[in-house]
Amino acid sequence: MARRRDELEDTFMYAVKEIYYTLQGEGAQTGRAAVFCRFAGCNLWSGREQDRATAICQFCDTDFADTNGPGGGKFASAEELADAIAAKWRDPAFPSPEIGTRDTHNAGPSTPAARAASAQEPGSFREFVVCTGGEPLLQLDADLIAALHDRGFEIAIETNGTIEALPGVDWICVSPKAGAQLKQRSGDELKLVYPQAGADPAAFEDLPFRHFLLQPMDGPQREENTALALKYCLEHPRWRLSLQTHKLIGIP
């Protein structure tokens, strides 16, 4: 089983599947430009198809095994990884030729100090990184949080909630999984893949989150699951429907 960064030996390297620039495709931040840093490894599934049937999470639709994706690799320090993430924002070759490439002439200040200062200006925006996986909290640590903040980034995580987030994370999205103990019980959004046997949305409604979202489970029953999620949101208006828009428009 994967271990947390602070439980590993001094020779630990951040293992990252891929780093890329795109739009957030789901949840409360849908449509927002972001650098995605997908960490390798998860504590609810190995990422190998031969293990799926015995995994706690059997419906994962993400390839997070190994470090062989675009921009991926092993990074020896938080500074090195933060630089790799910042480079994707400064010079983002948008990965979908059908959509086009982003104009980098208006990409914003080019140095960490200038970017951090500009984020404080009225009407400005902060560069945005989404730490995802796999399970990002197996590796995201205080050093990396500090290094990303030094470069002006707002930090979001997409977590299964089985590990408590460290201080300094700016946006916490928890996606609970049936059969896994929920330890991160507060945050900005709770995004529940629906339907899940053993994960009733009503069981999470008293938790202190700002946004509650139902996301239809992908796969062969996607249309049926979408109809069920739509019906639930109409009957329980606290919940909002989250669609995977990146899949609909063909971007990562």
Residues covered by each model-derived region:
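Conserved Radical SAM active-site core
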Residues: 3, 9-10, 14, 21, ...
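A broad structural signal for short, well-ordered beta-strand segments within beta-sheet-rich domains
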Residues: 15-16, 32
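Generic secondary-structure boundary/loop-capping signal
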Residues: 20, 26, 242-246
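S-adenosyl-L-methionine
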Residues: 23-34
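Short, intrinsically disordered, charge-biased short linear motifs at domain edges
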Residues: 27, 38-49
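Residues immediately within or flanking Cys/His clusters that coordinate Zn2+
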Residues: 34-39, 54-57
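A secondary-structure boundary/capping signal
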Residues: 38, 132-133, 244
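Conserved AdoMet/S-adenosylmethionine-binding subsite of the radical SAM
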Residues: 124-128, 137-252
